[in-house]
């Protein structure tokens, strides 16, 4: 969060974990208000809250509940190998790390979203004649997982859609033009995230502009 923004809470609570947690609570609530009725889902990055201990965990739980009250689908971004540990937060889906085996898919009632392609250097590794991440994506999709793919290139999106034609895709920071191959003719099959929205000076306006831009590429029927 912006230092000036956090300072307002430090002035109220002192330089304490409570100040950091309350800043996150206010920031998150503002973003949920902006998203309500305009976006289908929100992604809450668990680490940003849990780094502030029990108070941060409390804020995370409150934001999950608040998002559900606004009829938003909640994805808890943990990139975890043990998703059942986070079931108590009540999120609808959780990101999991698939490279430790299929045990990461034991997510209880949450949808496991396997983070098969990240921004790390390991994405260039090969498995036979194709990228390792595509091989992992295929295995995860066969077991019913959705797939998180971090890319800005339509070729990557085409590749994963070809290998996993029925998998639901979570595309991280991919613009509408490059994300287009992920969607079917009805505009279904994928969800795109836009991390820039959380830093917007006017979140409500930024959300409206983002929705307008996406509708140029994808129309949900």
Please state what every model-predicted region is.
Residues 37-41, 70-72, 90-92, 110-112, ...:
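Short, well-ordered coil/turn segments that N-cap beta-strands
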Residues 25, 147, 152-197:
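A C-terminal functional module that forms or caps the active site or interfaces directly
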Residues 181-221:
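C-terminal helical cap(s) of enzyme catalytic domains, especially alpha/beta-barrels
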Residues 51-66, 83, 98-110, 153-164, ...:
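Active-site-adjacent beta->alpha loops and helix N-cap segments on the catalytic face
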Residues 43-52, 73-79, 92-103, 115-117, ...:
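Catalytic beta/alpha-barrel core
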Residues 20-35, 82-86, 133-134, 178-180:
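Short, acidic/polar
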Residues 3-6, 10-11, 15, 82-148:
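Conserved anion-binding
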Residues 1-62, 66-69, 208-215, 219:
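Conserved N-terminal beta1-alpha1 strand-loop-helix module at the mouth
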